[in-house]
Design a protein with these regions (language model features):
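Non-catalytic interaction/Regulatory regions outside core domains
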Residues: 2-136
């Protein structure tokens, strides 16, 4: 198996683990285990959504190392409506929320920059203690 094919397969498997539908992963299941990125998109072709997916592919190890999971919600779905009400998110355009391991909203953004998210996470006390055993 070529290195390129193995890398693509690894990312695909990793992405299946980190991008999950809400029904399969209630938020309470992530408390104290994971940080959660929730994205709200009007379309599958939303530029910010596509940019985030590319960044997650390129930075899969750093994403996983920070105990991140991604919940991708599309406008019109029941989960989108429920979560946008719960978190007071507009139903137009792209919105990103970062939830800490404590379940609190740490970031609201209309842009998708994993570097900014990683920088914010790396300032959190819980993350600082985790960084002692980094895998990347």
């Amino acid at each position: 198996m070529s290195h390129r094919l193995a890398t693509a397969l690894l990312f695909t498997l990793t992405n299946l683990v980190i991008t999950m539908p809400l029904q399969a992963t209630p938020l309470k299941d992530h408390l104290w285990k994971n940080r959660v990125i929730i994205t709200f998109s009007a379309s599958v072709k939303e530029p910010e959504r596509l940019a985030l997916q590319k960044q997650m592919e390129e930075k899969a190890c750093a994403f996983t190392d920070r105990n991140l999971v991604h919940i991708d919600l599309l406008q019109g779905s029941e989960d989108f409506d429920e979560m946008s009400q719960q978190f007071a998110v507009s139903s137009s355009g792209f919105q990103l929320l970062l939830l800490g391991k404590d379940g609190g909203v740490k970031l609201r953004s209309s842009t998708a920059s994993l570097e900014d998210i990683f920088s914010l996470i790396d300032t959190m006390p819980m993350r600082r203690s985790e960084m002692r055993g980094d895998q990347c």
